[in-house]
Amino acid sequence: MKTQSIVRDFPIVCVGGSAGGLDSYIRLLQNLPDDLGAAIVIVNHLRTVATLLHEILPRHTKMPVELITEKLDIEPNHVFIIPEKRDLHVLNREFRLKPISKPRGWPDVITVFMRSLTENWDGKLISVIVSGYDGDGAAALCGIKEVGGITIAQKPDTASHPDMPESAIASGCIDFVLSPEDIAREIKRIVLAI
């Protein structure tokens, strides 16, 4: 058990977004170092954009960008993208995919993934909510804080669709409210302090 904890000691940064999230992801990645020492997982609940992110985002970071597949190893200094119509979980340092649990209405893939992290990841957790409709992710933020994680919302006036950041802020469980550029700086500060 001790060996697994040492292996999984690096942080995971979950970045959840939807409509308008692409701009936020780009601004964030452009300001993160390539040797950050954390895994970046982008959980976008807008299905059509999610499938294209692994093609678009490599233009904005030198970190490898991968579309998540079943049992893909989680590695630091990589950007991972959730595939469409899937719930994402972690288990034994791997990603696990399941059929989406909420196929109608607004999906809750961000909430599902963050809850899995709180139960199955030993390293530091940093959860970021950026531009998007609805309130996906907000319900899991207090759980992230309960396990010692850090929560960040995009400053609503810097988001093209502020619903998701506003819902996150309304949860009462947000540590920082920042622009994407400042989110990147804060993530770097947190990871370096670990």
What are these regions (language model features)?
Residues 1-194:
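Strand-loop microenvironment adjacent to phosphate/nucleotide-handling motifs in alpha/beta enzyme folds
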